[in-house]
């Protein structure tokens, strides 16, 4: 009932409803044993998927569940590093892509990810999808990079970010392509492969948010990093002491 009410409220506000779905095997099995249906079908039957919904994880979903997600236009936040750290499982990424589910990459949160490194998510998403399918072509570099950009924007309901185009917000990064990591390149697909298999946040030199520089030559411009680190350490000690 609570989820249905939240879904109604989200629809009335034209907001995105975000919830975690089918993250662990134990949770999913318990719900199915009690209700005789998967959590995806339970949510669909209660009208939760009637608006803009972002479902995190979706690890323990079958083909029927994926069809429901696709038909309802539910977007999925795929968080491969968190899923590995917590031992949750491997989401059926290739199957969701094939079914046309809107997919964006996420880091979940610092308690279940630590580094919050989106480049790592890109690589891990591709690797896990390939090993799960036993197929080295199951997911391409272009597909996972799209999940980190256009797909992520679509997943959270933003229609003016995620790519460089006229009228879009100027959210951009600069990558040091002169680094040996990214050579040689004889065609564009090779560069995409280098970005996925060998890229990292260490190769990002500059970041712009809405056209404003927030990282320049590897240094954050809008936060005093030394002060932030000192404050975090101080607060951690106080919290540990109770």
What annotation goes with each model-predicted range?
Residues 1-75, 87-103:
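Histidine/acidic residue-rich metal-binding segments in metalloenzymes
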Residues 3, 36, 115, 141, ...:
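Generic structural signal for well-ordered, non-membrane alpha-helical segments
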Residues 45-52, 94-181:
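His/Asp/Glu-enriched, well-ordered alpha-helical/loop segment
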Residues 85-90, 114-116, 185:
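Short, charged, surface-exposed secondary-structure boundary motifs
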